[in-house]
């Protein structure tokens, strides 16, 4: 595995827009509901953590593997949320720190550098993609 693409759906009792991602992810009610991923561009898979499914061990290992590039749209959000999740549920993998930002590529930044909008929906519309994010969160 050389590349891991990630997309999260999360919940927190803290308002992200008012408090920021760090306080959002540290809220006691914070949880990752869905963990979507693709390994090396293969078909995407979704883990339903809210229903009790678990992130596979190989994916957990890849999250802390410096040899695996992690990418996400708004990678800082995914990285901070995954760091909080790992500290709570897999402290042996991360301890008290955060996942290394040097191992992450942000597709939102790439999109912006190409003059595209800095929202996932905006990029999908600008590129006229058939598959767009649901308005229901």
Spans of model-derived segments:
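Entry/capping segment at the start of metal-dependent catalytic domains
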Residues: 1-30
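Intrinsic disorder/low-complexity segments enriched in polar/small residues
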Residues: 10, 136-137
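Active-site-proximal helix-loop-helix substrate-binding element of RNase H-like nuclease domains
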Residues: 30-32, 36-37, 41-58, 64-136
């Amino acid at each position: 595995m050389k590349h891991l693409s990630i997309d999260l759906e999360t919940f927190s009792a803290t308002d992200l827009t008012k408090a920021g991602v760090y306080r959002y992810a540290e809220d006691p009610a914070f949880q990752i509901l869905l963990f979507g991923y693709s390994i090396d561009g293969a078909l995407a898979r979704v883990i339903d953590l809210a229903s009790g499914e678990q992130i596979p061990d190989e994916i957990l290992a890849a999250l802390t593997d410096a040899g695996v590039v992690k990418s996400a749209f708004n990678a800082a959000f995914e990285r901070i949320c995954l760091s909080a999740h790992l500290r709570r549920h897999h402290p042996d993998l991360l301890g008290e720190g955060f996942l290394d930002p040097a191992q992450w590529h942000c597709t939102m930044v790439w999109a912006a550098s190409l003059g595209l909008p800095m929202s996932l929906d905006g990029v999908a519309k600008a590129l006229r993609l058939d598959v767009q994010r649901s308005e229901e969160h």
